[in-house]
């Protein structure tokens, strides 16, 4: 199993649940099998979209990207600019992103 060296965790907060649901639906249009293959070759190990549910009246998703290393991160940024950004730029959101280096990991 290949382990992640670098992780990006981003939250996007939407004005309404309707806009959030539109964004969620758009993911299958963005991440087609061909695009996923490009990201995989570039070194992205995993991506996860979560709908946050523990905050009342907050319409927020969490997006996790796991990369093989810093080079993979840099390469995947250009792919995100090519495939992802053009498809989501019309959404008005508050975006907070964080990059982390894996220090400790548990998996079963």
Predicted feature residues:
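Glycine-rich beta-strand-turn "strand-cap" elements at beta-sheet edges
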Residues: 1-4, 40-62, 85-108
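Short, well-ordered beta-strand segments in beta-rich or mixed alpha/beta enzyme
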Residues: 5-14, 46-81
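Generic alpha-helical secondary structure signal
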Residues: 13, 27, 35, 43, ...
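Short amphipathic alpha-helical segments
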Residues: 18-46, 81-88
């Amino acid at each position: 199993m290949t382990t992640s060296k670098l992780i990006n965790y981003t939250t996007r907060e939407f004005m309404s649940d309707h806009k959030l649901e539109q964004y969620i639906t758009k993911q299958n249009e963005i991440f087609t099998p061909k695009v996923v293959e490009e990201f995989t070759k570039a070194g992205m190990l995993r991506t996860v979209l979560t709908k946050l549910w523990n905050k009342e009246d907050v319409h927020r998703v969490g997006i996790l990207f796991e990369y093989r290393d810093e080079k993979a991160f840099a390469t995947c940024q250009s792919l995100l600019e090519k495939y992802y950004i053009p498809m989501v730029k019309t959404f008005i959101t508050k975006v907070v992103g964080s990059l982390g280096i894996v220090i400790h990991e548990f998996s079963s």
